[in-house]
Amino acid sequence: MVYAVLTGDIVGSSRVEGKAHLELNTSLKRSFELVKDTYRDAHSLPSFDIFRGDSFQGVLDNAIYALEASLLIRAHLRKDQVADQQSDWDARIAIGIGEIDYLPDNVSEGDGPAYRSSGPVLDRLKKETKLEIQTPWQEINDELSTECALLDAVIAGWTPSQAEA
């Protein structure tokens, strides 16, 4: 079975303080619930964990939904951002596509090629890059890299109202 592992972190979370930080964390959790609700009817059971305060990892048992799930998370964060914050709420997300050798209840403890590609990809993302997909196939990775860069450019211009639409 081909899985998608989404590994991400909140962009600029250290600059979000007090009540706004709690609201940001709540928004992230609600975005995970949105993903779960969206794919429940597709017989897919997404699962997510938050760790280190602003990092997260999720698994989709059908990789076809990975890009859309990432967009749902990012759009939800941008929609919920607090107006007086100096930075937009957003997430950097690395998607690893592949097999999983071990999938426990706590998804951040899993292992396999999909896990081992998503973590290092997140670590390599540049400041302006917020989405990257890694598959076992280099030609597809090259194509997806270009498409993710274009998608990042579009998302960067979203207002909260546009993200909600």
Regions found by a protein language model. Give the residues of each.
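Regulatory and interdomain segments flanking nucleotide-handling catalytic cores
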Residues: 1-165
